């Protein structure tokens, strides 16, 4: 699968593309994730038989660019929570038109790990252009997540959630809520978008165990769900 590095609207991007792709995957990528992207793509390809195009775009400030609202447990910086809409705007106004022009209009999966997973899950309540969300170990422990989720419709057709089975075992009281919150979220999604349109996978270990493989499994589930629903 060819790998292309490009600058799109000032952001560093990496594109992996099969011929005649049927699905577009989008992922915010931090510096710590760049080294494992090749392995992530190989893991996806080893799971699905559907051609796809993957586009990752660089995130330079993980907290600033991905956190949807202020939470001092994420960062004490007051600016954190003000710029997720800027990131979402880059995707909808710059990245998607660019990719669609090159590869055609495709079903879109927005995915991410940790704060990027939170961002992806939040984004599908703000824009209707995403068909599925791949939220691996999303930071759903953010303050007021349940209130937000309960008040906002999910526009995506499919939602994948996962969490390590030891992630909620922590002395950090804020992060310790992630298990209860993701269980609540899964129940909420079953009621709102349907049992066949969402899943919650419990991975082994803590938060930092093979994130790229967890995310690959998330993307693969979304690809399979979207392509099956088209036939």
Identify what each model region corresponds to:
Residues 19-102:
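Serine-hydrolase catalytic machinery in alpha/beta-hydrolase-like enzymes
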Residues 214-231:
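Catalytic active-site module of serine/aspartate enzymes centered on a nucleophile-bearing elbow/loop
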Residues 1-23, 52, 56, 198:
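A domain-start/cap signature at the N-terminus of enzymes
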Residues 111-116, 120:
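Gly/Ala-rich beta-loop-alpha elbow adjacent to hydrolase catalytic centers
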Residues 122-132:
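Conserved hydrolase catalytic core segment
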Residues 107-112, 136:
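Short beta-strand immediately N-terminal to the catalytic nucleophile in serine-hydrolase-like folds
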Residues 140-214, 222:
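The feature captures the conserved acid-bearing segment of alpha/beta-hydrolase catalytic domains
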Residues 26-30, 137, 163:
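The conserved beta1-alpha1 loop
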């Amino acid at each position: 699968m060819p790998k292309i590095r490009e600058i799109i609207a000032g952001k560093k991007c990496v594109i992996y593309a099969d011929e005649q792709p049927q699905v577009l995957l989008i992922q915010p990528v931090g510096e710590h994730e760049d080294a494992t992207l090749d392995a992530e793509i190989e893991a996806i390809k080893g799971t699905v038989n559907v051609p796809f195009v993957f586009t990752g775009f660089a995130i330079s400030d993980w907290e600033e660019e991905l956190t949807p609202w202020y939470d001092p447990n994420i960062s004490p910086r007051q600016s954190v929570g003000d710029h997720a809409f800027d990131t979402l705007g880059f995707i909808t106004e710059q990245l998607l038109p660019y990719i669609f022009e090159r590869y055609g209009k495709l079903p879109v999966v927005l995915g991410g790990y940790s704060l990027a997973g939170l961002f992806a899950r939040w984004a599908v309540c703000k824009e209707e252009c995403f068909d599925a969300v791949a939220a691996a170990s999303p930071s759903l422990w953010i303050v007021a997540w349940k209130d937000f989720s309960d008040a906002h419709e999910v526009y995506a057709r499919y939602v994948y959630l996962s969490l390590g089975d030891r992630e909620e075992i922590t002395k950090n009281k804020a992060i310790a809520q992630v298990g209860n919150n993701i269980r609540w979220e899964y129940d909420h999604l079953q009621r709102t978008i349907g049992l066949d349109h969402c899943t919650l996978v419990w991975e082994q270990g803590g938060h930092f165990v093979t994130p790229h493989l967890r995310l690959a499994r998330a993307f693969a589930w979304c690809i399979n769900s979207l392509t099956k629903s088209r036939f």
